[in-house]
Amino acid sequence: MELVVGRVAKSHGVRGELVVEVRTDDPDARFAEGTVLRGRLPRSTEVREFTVESAREHSGRLLVSLAGVDDRSAADALRGTLFVVDSAELPPSDDPDEFYDHELEGLSVRDTAGAVLGTVTEVLHSAAGELLSMRAAEDGREILIPFVTAIVPTVSVAEGYVVIDPPEGLLDPE
């Protein structure tokens, strides 16, 4: 399974730097100097390899320089490029309470009594922590669930579900 670890949002400056929207939990490793990235170009099935020359944070954004991308027009041509990795290449986690996003997406969401409430559609990473986005089985609306042990006490990737113990009001329609 191919996983997106970053997306080129736009160019930055005139020397070919790229603003990359990070979609990985470890950008320091993924975008380290010398790392070879596979990039899926927009509106194309072509995948190219790019070597990271440098990466730095600037105003809360990741700026990346790639070998051979030396000016603004070359950087602009990469706008929308998705940097991808194969999930089979990811190392297994040493922590049983740590999961890759793709392992959680698609899991059934149950309450503590076992009733199916919905499906995890996405894992969102925010400054305040991770959130599970759930599509409610009842009406299809999106519900954001803080991914903390107090609210999500059980995760069973092997059995295909998470159990939530929602605080009052979390599941209520607005």
Swiss-Prot record:
Every PRC barrel domain range: 96-170
Pfam family, one: RimM
Chief location bin: cytoplasm
One cellular component (GO) term of this entry: cytoplasm
GO function terms (MF aspect): ribosome binding
Location(s), subcellular: Cytoplasm
Any GO BP: ribosomal small subunit biogenesis
Entry keyword set: Chaperone, Cytoplasm, Ribosome biogenesis, rRNA processing
Function of the protein: An accessory protein needed during the final step in the assembly of 30S ribosomal subunit, possibly for assembly of the head region. Essential for efficient processing of 16S rRNA. May be needed both before and after RbfA during the maturation of 16S rRNA. It has affinity for free ribosomal 30S subunits but not for 70S ribosomes.
Self-association and partners: Binds ribosomal protein uS19.
PANTHER family per UniProt: RIBOSOME MATURATION FACTOR RIMM
Domain comment (free text): The PRC barrel domain binds ribosomal protein uS19.
Family of this protein: Belongs to the RimM family.
Protein's name in the database: Ribosome maturation factor RimM
Native source species: Nocardia farcinica (strain IFM 10152)
